């Protein structure tokens, strides 16, 4: 050992490093997860695709959010309008970017996930509708007709970059699902366009931006309304061949022989697999693909299954080796307690199944090693076909990008009318395979199947182009090295049908019809639980295909060859396919019963619900007009749609307008307050920009504010009507009280009829308001006659007025016990005289108990007579005193000995005369801080030291000044009334603010002078 090596061994740092390495090696692989931060928000879509952070061309974060919202949020009321918690949204964002596995159901909620989706779109460096094309979108909607708009809009959408196009299509597809549930979530197309318009179009701030945003929202609504036309119009004549080939494709679910080779598809396994290096993009025009008519789509390896051609001589040996290999490794790889980790069939195209539990990294490594060894041993795999081992592993990734059959079945109803009409006539009999002459002609090429799925799925457009160029070389290798294979023919794939959405492939596996052919070439065996179906558009030509089967066999070419199921085993050993999940494997289950997927929990709960009828099959919406599907009792997952217990439309799922009528007063009040707040914000914003308050015409010019104003008036009217109904309802106790939050349809129809009958009976018994008033007045007249009380209040004494008050009070209580307080305008007008008389009597009694000190005219103001306040009418509390009508006689007779104390004897007539003089009230000037002339009077500070003659002289001067100012103010208010047709309000007094303030100070000084004179008079008498 050299000196250097000895020094390293003796170094403590080296020993410590060695110990640390031992610890790292000793830690299991599944505990060594290091989540690295990777920015997802605020990154361009092209960059996300380059980094491999997309699924089928859609950003992974968007994919996860939309999948979660599709399952849990479609019926959430106020979806996308109700914002999520800011902290929760930020935590979800950090988790996504740090690489931590995110479960939106546990870590967040529906509102937070919706807010996170809007945040992702909002933070894109270039908006979803790119800034380069946005002016053209806006210009298109500013001029042009409807038909021109639609065709031009379709062309503009095609000009979007691939990543933007795919995301826009995926987003619009999801939003159309949300709009279909607008009865529950209150989000129709226009509401969704209002929410997502600002997120898909980035407009500049300011007034111009607001106008531009309104147009962008209309564009978004147009895109959502015409989603099928704008995005699926690419299904043109160039796609006919592809449609027919895909329609004839046989997709086989899991077909397990008693034992099978386990192939685990978990998301954890997909993450650990090496990704193929990025490939350079070869520019190519969108129409170039249609010229290359004879190029074969060669797929990459899928699910670790190599490209192979099964020969008859290898079939039995393969099955025996697979049975023996499974016995050694199935116990390690597939736990019996986890049914979700069951192996998947190589023919099962959709690996987008719900996420299952991840096996440890060590188990994954072991599984991959064993699988590759078994494949090489069983299938004699070589990599000379242009696929490396990394490509083989990356095929698992491609399998995960497909949608599950269950999801395709659930989404099929969205493609009903468009696809049903479009697929008519897409028939090419030459491409219809009827069978195979020899077993050697049957190729089970899973890579071809998966590649067709991936190209039809189409959103990962850039990465699929170089693979298509490579496929021509592989085709030549197939012809050179493998004899007896079925010829291949490619699709005339244009750029337009590379970019088809995830829903364009839905009908491949779940919308087929079982066929039975007795031709001499091949027999297709089918069981009651597995039917291999054709596309419905091909059923009309089934007999013609049988007749031309001989010609087709010679010239038959297909993009994806059919698998002859007889090539897998002998006819005598043919068995039923074993379902992929153990929960489906029930020995006692009827073979004719449709199997439900593990995700059918919500369907089962709804079917087993006590008050609910069985739900319709999802296929009913897509093919509701086709009798061949209505009468097919074998169609999973539900019974036939023509059965008598078809679910009827519940009244609780009525239109939004019907539910509007059922709003409670509290809900109406909340909506009114919300609308008033929105209008107030608009007014404030308008005032900041224009420097003046918006008029009614300004509000009407804005469509949104005009809608708010109309809704506000409508809700106010409904609130008034609901209050009227409540006031007219009988207050008798009811047998059953229902919550206001439940729709009225939950109540029994019989109960509603009983309530209506009871209301009619009550209305028939209850007298009218006029009849009640007449009876009350008749009783009051009788009581007055019994007690010899005069009818005129002026002629009554104090005791008689007190008795009159009690009688009026009892009469009004009797009226309110029958009809309640007067609410409507008619009731108020009828009952106004009686209420006014009662109010006047009360005021006289309260006034009589307050004896003023001095008989000065100012004593009238110490307890002014308040006028009746009528509901719904504008009350004016600021009217002038008619003191000048007394003339100058009262003022000229003012002498030092004018003090006259009021007699203790009560006279109702003198009080009423005084009330008539005070009927117009008094002016209450605006509380302004403008300095008054009187405040600068130097004699004001010396009033306390002045003599009585000086005080009286000053009092006379102040009265003259008060009359002068009052006359000036009266002229101003009369002119204002003639010009505007209403009384002067406080905010209208600005031009005369100084006069009002001066008038206020003069009144205060007059009160002070009267108090001083009264005080001096009492002092002189006491002396």
UniProtKB/Swiss-Prot annotation:
Positions of modified residues (Phosphoserine): 345, 597, 617, 727
Residues with Phosphothreonine modification: 732
InterPro entries, A to Z: FAM13, Rho_GTPase_activation_prot, RhoGAP_dom
Residues marked Arginine finger (site): 81
CDD domains for the chain: RhoGAP_FAM13A1a
Regions that span the bilayer: none
Molecular function GO labels: GTPase activator activity
Low complexity compositional bias, start-end: 384-405
Residue ranges with Basic and acidic residues bias: 412-427, 509-524, 750-759
Gene Ontology biological-process annotations: regulation of small GTPase mediated signal transduction; signal transduction
Coiled coil region boundaries: 666-730, 946-978
GO cellular component: cytosol
Domain Rho-GAP: 43-231
Tissue and organ expression note: Isoform 1 is widely expressed, with highest expression in skeletal muscle, thymus, brain and lung. Isoform 3 is less abundant than isoform 1 and predominantly expressed in kidney, pancreas, liver, lung and thymus.
UniProt xrefs under PROSITE patterns: RHOGAP
Name of the featured protein: Protein FAM13A
Species this protein is from: Homo sapiens
Region (Disordered): 269-290, 381-437, 459-562, 628-663, 726-759
Alphabetical UniProt keywords: Coiled coil, GTPase activation, Phosphoprotein
Compositional bias per record (Polar residues), positions renumbered to this chain: 536-549, 738-748
Pfam families for this protein: RhoGAP (PF00620)
């Amino acid at each position: 050992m050299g000196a250097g090596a000895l020094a390293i061994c003796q170094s403590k740092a080296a020993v410590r490093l060695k110990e640390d390495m031992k610890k790292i090696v000793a830690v299991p692989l599944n505990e060594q997860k290091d989540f690295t931060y990777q920015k997802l928000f605020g990154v361009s879509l092209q960059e996300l695709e380059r980094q491999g952070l997309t699924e089928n061309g859609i950003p992974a974060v968007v994919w996860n959010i939309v999948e979660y919202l599709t399952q849990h949020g479609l019926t959430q009321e106020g979806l996308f309008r109700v914002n999520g918690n800011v902290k929760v949204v930020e935590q979800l964002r950090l988790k996504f970017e740090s690489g931590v596995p995110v479960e939106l159901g546990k870590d967040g909620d529906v509102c937070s996930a919706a807010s996170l989706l809007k945040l992702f779109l909002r933070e894109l460096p270039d908006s979803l509708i790119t800034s380069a094309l946005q002016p053209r979108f806006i210009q298109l909607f500013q001029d042009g007709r409807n038909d021109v708009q639609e065709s031009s809009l379709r062309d503009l959408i095609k000009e979007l970059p691939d990543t933007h196009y795919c995301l826009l299509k995926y987003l619009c597809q999801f939003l159309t699902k949300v709009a279909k549930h607008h009865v529950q979530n209150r989000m129709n197309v226009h509401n969704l366009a209002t929410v997502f318009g600002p997120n898909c179009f980035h407009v500049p701030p300011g007034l111009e931006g607001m106008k531009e945003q309104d147009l962008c929202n209309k564009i978004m609504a147009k895109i959502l309304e015409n989603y099928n036309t704008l995005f699926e119009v690419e299904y043109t004549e160039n796609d006919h061949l592809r449609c027919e080939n895909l329609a004839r494709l046989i997709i086989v679910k899991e077909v397990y022989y008693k034992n099978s080779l386990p192939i685990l598809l978990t998301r954890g396994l997909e993450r650990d697999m090496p990704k193929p290096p990025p490939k350079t993009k070869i520019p190519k025009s969108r129409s170039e693909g249609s010229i290359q008519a004879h190029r074969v789509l060669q797929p990459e390896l899928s699910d670790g299954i190599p490209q192979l051609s099964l020969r008859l001589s290898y079939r039995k040996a393969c099955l025996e080796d697979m049975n023996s290999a499974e016995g050694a490794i199935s116990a390690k790889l597939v736990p019996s307690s986890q049914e979700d980790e069951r192996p998947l069939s190589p023919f099962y195209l959709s690996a987008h199944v719900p996420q299952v539990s991840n096996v440890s990294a060590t188990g994954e490594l072991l599984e991959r090693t064993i699988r590759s060894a078994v494949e090489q041993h069983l299938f004699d795999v070589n990599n000379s076909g242009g696929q490396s081992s990394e490509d083989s592993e990356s095929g698992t990734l491609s399998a995960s990008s497909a949608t599950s059959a269950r999801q395709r079945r659930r989404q099929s109803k969205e493609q009903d009318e468009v696809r049903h009409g479009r697929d008519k006539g897409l028939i090419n009999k030459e491409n219809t395979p009827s069978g195979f002459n020899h077993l050697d002609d049957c190729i089970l090429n899973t890579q071809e199947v998966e590649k067709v799925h991936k190209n039809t799925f189409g959103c990962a457009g850039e990465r699929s182009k170089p693979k298509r160029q490579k496929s021509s070389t592989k085709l030549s290798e197939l012809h050179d090295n493998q004899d007896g294979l079925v010829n291949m023919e490619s699709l005339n794939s244009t750029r337009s049908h590379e970019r088809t959405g995830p829903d364009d492939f839905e009908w491949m596996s779940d919308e087929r019809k079982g066929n039975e052919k007795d031709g001499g070439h091949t027999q297709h065996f089918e069981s009651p639980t597995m039917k291999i179906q054709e596309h419905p558009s091909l059923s009309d030509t089934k007999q013609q295909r049988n007749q031309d089967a001989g010609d087709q066999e010679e010239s038959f070419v297909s993009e994806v060859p059919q698998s002859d199921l007889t090539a897998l085993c002998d006819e005598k050993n043919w068995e039923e396919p074993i379902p992929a999940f153990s929960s489906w494997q029930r020995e006692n289950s009827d073979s004719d019963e449709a199997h439900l997927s593990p995700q059918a929990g919500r369907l089962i709960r709804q079917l087993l619900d006590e008050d609910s009828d069985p739900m319709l099959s999802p296929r009913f919406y897509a093919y509701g007009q086709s009798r061949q599907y209505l009468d097919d009792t074998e169609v999973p997952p539900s019974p036939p749609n023509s059965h008598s217990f078809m679910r009827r439309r519940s009244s609780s799922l009525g239109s939004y307008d019907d539910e509007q009528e059922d709003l409670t007063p509290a809900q109406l009040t909340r909506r009114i307050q919300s609308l008033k707040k929105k209008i107030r914000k608009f007014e404030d914003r308008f005032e900041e920009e224009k420097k003046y308050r918006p008029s009614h015409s300004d509000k009407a010019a804005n469509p949104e504010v005009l809608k708010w104003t109309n809704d506000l008036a409508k809700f106010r009217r409904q609130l008034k009507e609901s209050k009227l109904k409540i006031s007219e309802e009988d207050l008798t106790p009811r047998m059953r009280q229902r919550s206001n939050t439940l729709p009225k349809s939950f109540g029994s129809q019989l109960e509603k009829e009983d309530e209506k009958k009871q209301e009619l009976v009550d209305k028939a018994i209850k007298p009218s308001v006029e009849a009640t008033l007449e009876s009350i007045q008749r009783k009051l007249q009788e009581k007055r006659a019994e007690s010899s009380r005069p009818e005129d209040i002026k002629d009554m004494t104090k005791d008689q007025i007190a008795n009159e008050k009690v009688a009026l009070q009892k009469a009004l209580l009797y009226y309110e016990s029958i009809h309640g307080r007067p609410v409507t305008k008619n009731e108020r007008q009828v009952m106004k005289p009686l209420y006014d008389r009662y109010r006047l009597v009360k005021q006289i009694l309260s006034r009589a108990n307050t004896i003023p000190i001095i008989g000065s005219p100012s004593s009238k103001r110490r307890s002014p007579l308040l006028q009746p306040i009528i509901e719904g009418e504008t009350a004016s509390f600021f009217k002038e005193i008619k003191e000048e009508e007394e003339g100058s006689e009262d003022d000229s007779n003012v002498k030092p000995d004018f003090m006259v104390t009021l007699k203790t004897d009560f006279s109702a007539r003198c009080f009423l005369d005084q009330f008539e003089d005070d009927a117009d009230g008094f002016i209450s000037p605006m509380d302004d801080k403008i300095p008054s002339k009187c405040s600068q009077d130097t004699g004001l500070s010396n009033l306390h030291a002045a003599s009585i003659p000086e005080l009286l002289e000053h009092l006379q001067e102040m009265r003259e000044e008060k009359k002068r100012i009052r006359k000036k103010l009266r002229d101003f208010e009369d002119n204002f009334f003639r010009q505007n047709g209403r009384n002067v309000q406080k905010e209208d007094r600005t031009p005369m603010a100084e006069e009002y303030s001066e008038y206020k100070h003069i009144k205060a000084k007059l009160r002070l002078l009267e108090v001083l004179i009264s005080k001096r008079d009492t002092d002189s008498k006491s002396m």
